Structure formats: C-alpha cells, structure tokens
Amino acid sequence: MIMNMTTDYRDPLLDLFGTESNSGNETSSPSDIPVINRSGTFNQQQFSPLLTQQSLYNTPNSGSTPNIFDPNYTQMQEEQTSPSSNKLQPEDPPRKKRNTRSQTKIHQQSEGDEYNSNDYKDSIDLDKPPVVEPSPPFFVESDTTPEFVIPTPTSEQQQQQHHELIAQDYQRSNNSNQFGNLTHYEPNLPPLPPLSESILPQTNTFHPLVLPHDPRHAITAGPANNSQQQQQQQQQDSSIPSDGISSKIQQLHAPSLSNNQSASQRKKKESSGPKTRPAFVMKIWSMVNDPANHEYIRWNDDGKTFQVFHREDFMKVILPKYFKHNNFASFVRQLNMYGWHKVQDVANGTLNQNSDKNGQDEIWQFENPNFIKDREDLLDKIVRNKSSSNQDDVSGVSFNGINNSANLSLILQELETIKMNQYVISEDLRRVRQDNKMLWQENYLNRERNQVQGRTLDKILKFLSVVYGNNANKILNGHGFADFNDSNNIMTQYRPSPMGSPLLSRPQTQPPPSNSRFARDNNQTAQPTYESPLSTSDTNNNNNNTFEYQQAVNRPRLMLTNRAHSRRPSMSRTKSTPEGSIEEIIRSYSNDKAAESNVNRMYEQLVGHQPGATTNNNNHSSSTAISAPSPRHSFLQELNLPGTPRNLDDLEKHINKEGQSIQQVQDWIDKLAQEQHEKQQQQQGNDDDDDFDVNEFLKDATTTPSSNVPNGGHYNNGNISFVGSPIAMTPGSNVSSNINDSDGNEKKSKKRSIEEVSDH
C-alpha cells in the first residue's frame, strides 16, 4: 500500500512548539506535550483576576462564590443535578479539538485509542507537577476543591456585560473608599478644595541605571528570569549535540579563564625578573658608608642605626649631593615611607640641658630592621609602604576591574536615586506650600466671619441687657420663662408669619391679655381666649414634632416694663407732672371703651383675624392659612433668604414691626392698669382708724367742694360760715384748719383722732 505523502506528512515542529501552521496562536492537543498543565497557576495572570479570569465567577465546581450576574447560573445548577447530565459530563477537563486536516483517519483513530487508554492517563498523572490544595473559602462548606477548572461556555455579549459590571463595582468601591462620609460641607458655603496628595508612593516608578557588571543585577532578577534562562538552556541543550557541550561550557567560562590566566602571567613576570632596589635606599646606603660624610652622618656603635649630626650643615652640604633638594623634613618623610623610624634618645633632644635652643647639637637617629651595617643583602627587603589598593594589585586579585565597575555602577545608581528623591521632595514641598496657602486663606475668611458674628452677638447682648435688665442672664442661660411669671416680668410669645406673599391672611398668633377680675371691676366684658394657631390637621400630623416646632417658631416677644423704661422722664412716676402722669393714662384707658375697641380692631386686622369671626368658613380659612409651612430656621436666616424679593422682605418686616409695637403698647397699658388697680385696692384695704382725722371729716361735712366763698357766707374769726347752716361743735375741736394768732400769722391746727376727741 502506497501512502499519500501530501496527506500523511506531519510537520515535526508541531510537536515541539505546540502550534499548527494554520492555527495561529492555538494551543496543541494534550498528546503533543502532556507534561504542561495549562489550567495551573503558572499561566494565569496575577494582576487582573477580576477582569480576565472567568473561572472566578462562572465555575460552579470551584470553591469560590458563584456569579450572581450570570443569567445561565440557575440553568447550570439544574443541569448538574439532573442524572442525565452526570453521564454527559467528561471526567477530564475538555480540551480544544486538534486541527486534523493534515492527518488521515488512521492517525486520528490511533491517537484516539492512545488517549482513551489507561496507560496514557497514568503517564499524564505521573508527569504532572504536584498540586497544592488551597485552603477552602470562607462561605463554602465543601472541604475539597477540584483539581481542574471547567470554564462555563458563555457568549461574547455575556462576557462584555460581566466586564462592565465588574468595572463599575470596582470604580464605585474606589470612590467610596477615597472619600467616604468623613467630610460634610455647609449648604450655604462653597466646598473646600481637597488637599493634594503626596506623590511619594504613587509616582515613584523610577528604574535606576543597571550596568552589566552590577552585582545586584543577579539578586534583583526574579524567579521568572531564572525559569526563562533554564528553559532556554534546556532548548539549547536539546538542539546542541553531545559533542558540542564542552565547547559551549568553554564559551560560557571563557571570561573567567582569561582573567585567571592574566593574573598568573603577571605573577610569573614579577617573580622571574631581577629585583631592583629603590634608588632612595641605595643613596642612603652610600651616604652612610662614605667616610667623607662621617662628620654629618655615620653608623651607630651597634651598627643597627645611623645618626645625623649638625642638621643645618647636613642640609647645606650632604643633601644637595644626593638629592635635588636640601629640605630636611622631606628627607625624614621619605625615610618614614621606606620603613625607617626615629629613635628618641634620652641624652639628646630637648631633654638635654646643654643642647642649643635652635637644636644644632640634637642628634637624629633612625632605625630600620633591614638596614644593618655590612648586610647589603637585606636591602632587597626594604620596599616602599603601599596602600590597600596597591596591595590588592600585588596580591594578584583578578576581580579588581569587575569590583571597580560594580562600585561605579552602585555609585551611579545611588546618585540617580538621590536625584529622584530630591525631585519627589521638591514636589511634596510645592504641594505643602499650596495647601498651606489655601489653609491660610480659609483661616482668614473664618476669622472675618467670626469677627462679624462677634459684633452681632455683642449688639444682641447689649439690647437684651437694656430691655430685660438683670433678668437677661436667666434668659440666656436657658432657665425658661417660668421665673418671669411675676407682675413685673410678664412674657408673651410672638410667632412671625411665614415668609410669602403679603396678601395671604395672617393668623393671630397671640390674643391681647385679658383679666377677668379686672374686667368685672371696670364693668367690662373679658375678651374670649383664642385657640392655638396650629390647626387640628397640623396637630395630628405633627404629634411627634410639637415641641421642636414650637421651639423653632415661637419666639419671646420684647415687652415694655416699668423697670426697663424707667429712664424716660415721661414714663417715670416720680418725675411725672399731674397733667401727663401714668394714672391719667390708665384712667383714660379704663374709662374710654372706644379707644380700647379701636386698638383691638387695629391689632386684629394687622395680625389677620377679624373681630367676631366665629363662622366655619373663617375657621377653615384660618386653618388653611395656618397650615402653610413655616420656616424652622432662625430669624436672621429668614430675613436673608436668597429667593425672597427685597420689597416683600421689607414689607413683611414693616408689618411685623408695626403689629409688634401696637401689641406691646397694649400689653404695657394693661399691665400698668392692673398694677394701679391692685395698688388702689391694697391701699383701701390697709386704711386704719389711726389715720382718721375728725377735723378734716367735719370740715368736709360743713363745707362745699367749691374753693370760693358763697354768697350767704361770712367770716367768723377767720372761719367760713353760712347763714342758717348748723355748725357741729365738739369740745376742743377747731372748725377751721388755719388760726390767726395775735401777730396775724397763720398756724396749722393739730389733727386729732377719734381717741383724742373721746378723751375730752
């Protein structure tokens, strides 16, 4: 049988890379690469699980919470519970069907048999990596979680809806967490601009410079890079034959081998070449051993040190011969660099009293363990002192270049980091300055408002102190009006009408005060008491808010009292004249009924009630007028409403002021009349017989009220008498109150009581 090569040919790269030539990015079947677990955590995206992983919401077999947004969720549950669905569900996770256009039916059948065989399944289980069972979720009772995730087949529209809903929920959660319910602004004031946020944690995405020889580059590299490198090495190892492995290893380790070879070559060169003695050491050796210089420099007796005499002469004579300078300090410094040390002798130096002050007789002695008399071979050991870097070079460390480059890279990286931090700090400083400026502006505005409110409160307190006097403190402290029930501090309540059109009917807020006792004494009928301005419908609807409504609407009205207005001379009893006294005002008010009715009529018309309006229609109209909503804010805010026209506001204030002033005058008159009446009754009840004057009584009985002498009268010893009128004479009584003495002066007679008359 001859096979067709066009249909039976199969590209070997399909098994290696897992893709078809016509399939694009499609994955291969499990028969190609059975080791890779595509449903594991290795191929899952870690940063966007909410928007990309459908298995978190559409998998009923997983341990997570089912998706409530999926309309097919209930249908899925029913299908899973049915017995027929259990037979249809495959045991292994479904895999995409392989493109079999380049295979024959024989190959397909053979692959199907291999897939269904138990040996193949066992090989898959052995090649799979160990699966770590995650902890069970919080809201699921099942203790076991499935190994594979079966994705639910969903349409593109459903997936798009899921994405949109998840994005909306995520945005709402961010908005709620950002602001929350922490800030509440006043409705009348504009909201404050939010303070700017720091840019330190958000925008610090700076990636420092990384050089190729940076040692931290290998440390910062993640496990992903290591895994990628391992995969690449495996592929290269699989593609490279066994004979080329050694060459590959040699290529990888070529730099290190070259460095080691260069270091060993340096060591060999240094060891093989002849050692050269330093020129300075040889000059010192010849200088000390020359007999011509023994006057200035020579060996010590023990031969281990040499001494220098006459320093000034040594500088002028010896040093110029061997060196290009004549500086003794530089000569000593070079000796120290090559290992010589100064030996301090007790017999020399400043401790010697015979030495000159200039130090000419001072002997300088230097010692070196390798500089000994007649031991020239030890001069090879005298070397110049070297720094740590030079010692490292001599020791032959092969990684100096790498270390230097690494140190340079670290320095550059730290420099870039410092620059970035400085930029971030400057941005934060600018932000703090802006916030500080804004806070200062708000503080200035609040201070201005506080000053205006303080001036307003001062005016209110001064006004209350003038009106109420000493009782203003009780009102301000909130003791209520229970302490002002006495006659001198009568308080009434005044409720202003709601803001609106001036054509609306105004209900009477408070009837004029009436006293039944005072009305009966003056032959007047007491005025009927009016009901509360609140209608029955309002009372039924506002049972729970009665106290709050009365506290917000009813306000104490200013009263005129004797104490508050005692400063005016026209109202003072002590300084008033007989023509304009308060008694005459009370008398006219109590006697003139027309004036009283006129005042009451004016008051009722201003407030909104007509006298005698007791019909049902009027009551209905008043209740409807009263049922209008009244503002619950303060009086100052009521006058400053932005939607109220200016002319209506002024008219409303004018009407309220006129009605209040008329009611105040009326209440003031009622109060004064009541006080005067009570005082008169008290005086009449307190009259005693001890104050009764008989002479005055007899005088009133015998004389007329007229002050002029009538036509029938004549004077009798200075007394007025009438013709034919009887004169009551009592023992020791005087008819006239005035008696003329012998000198013609008038003397007042002494009053006599009833007891004195009875004694006579």
From Swiss-Prot:
Residue stretches in coiled coil: 646-684
Primary location class: nucleus
Record has Transcription as a keyword: yes
Basic and acidic residues: compositionally biased ranges: 119-130, 744-760
GO biological process: cellular response to heat; positive regulation of DNA-templated transcription; positive regulation of transcription by RNA polymerase II
GO CC annotation terms, alphabetical: nucleus
Phosphoserine: residues bearing it: S570, S576
Pfam family, one: HSF_DNA-bind
PTM comment: Activated by phosphorylation of at least Ser-570, Thr-574, Ser-576 and Thr-577 in response to heat shock. Additional unidentified residues are also phosphorylated in response to heat shock.
Induction (record text): Induced during exposure to the weak acid stress of acetic acid, through the regulation by the transcription factor MNL1.
Keywords assigned by UniProt, alphabetized: Activator, Coiled coil, DNA-binding, Nucleus, Phosphoprotein, Stress response, Transcription, Transcription regulation, Virulence
Consequence of gene disruption: Leads to lethality.
Subunit structure: Homotrimer. Homotrimerization increases the affinity of HSF1 to DNA. Interacts with HSP90.
Function: DNA-binding transcription factor that specifically binds heat shock promoter elements (HSE) and activates transcription. With HSP90, is required for the modulation of the chaperone levels in response to growth temperature, rather than the activation of acute responses to sudden thermal transitions. Activated during infection and contributes to full virulence.
PANTHER family on file: HEAT SHOCK FACTOR PROTEIN, HEAT SHOCK TRANSCRIPTION FACTOR
Name listed for the protein in its UniProt record: Heat shock transcription factor
Lineage of origin: Eukaryota, Fungi, Dikarya, Ascomycota, Saccharomycotina
